Amino acid sequence: MEARLQSEGRGFGALSILRCWLGAALRTALAAAAPDQTAREIENLSHFLKKQETLQRLARAFGYDASKVTLSPQTKTFDYLGQSFTSEGQSFANGCIEIYYDPQMSDARLGCCLAHELQHVRYFLVRDAYCAEPADGPLHRRFAKYAPEALAAQRGVSNYSNEHWDAWKGGAPPTLFSFELEEGGSEPINETIAEVAKALYNWGPDVRINPLWRELHDAINEEYTALHRG
């Protein structure tokens, strides 16, 4: 798979595939963390401390608990489809997010990475609520229109998300709020929605983007907000 992404309007240059997927199969492929002494040295660098402050500020600007977002001095890699990639960030089901320090990472790129990972956190929370309710529950009713065939027909909104569609190995198109990685070896829906969030952050609300994916992104965020209020 060619590692590529489109350039971003806020100076977010062309990227390799840098998303670290959740799931035990890929977690075991993560490289060992940098030695402790090296990590401590990095954490004391003035540039690292400045980026850490910027990340905390960005998290607060997103309305997110900054204590759950950390800048890690570690470098992590993962193998996917026979290639090795470096991860920019990782989100966890408990709402925590790690961004991996890169001295070359601009503030714009840092914000885009955080926007992408935060959307995964929102998706996970709504997915958990969806899976916990009965088949005729309110979330099932709201999201019924986003059938597998309808989403598959749209494909992704970026080269990166389209690579997830190309890599899908399931016997049928992926289903919204399913455990895609376990079922088909990639996460087309989850990653496409996260790429919508990144595009909206990067280009603003007037960005031209697939209307069905934009609608689904907005619906997930509305339900995420409602779940938090509840």
Predicted regions and their residues:
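Non-Sec secretion/translocation targeting segments of pathogen effectors
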Residues: M1-S7, G11-R19, A24, T28-A32, ...
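Active-site helix/loop module of the DD-peptidase/beta-lactamase fold
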Residues: L55
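Active-site-flanking segments in enzyme catalytic domains
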Residues: A33-E43, A61-G230
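Well-ordered, non-membrane alpha-helical segments in soluble/globular domains
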Residues: H47-Q52
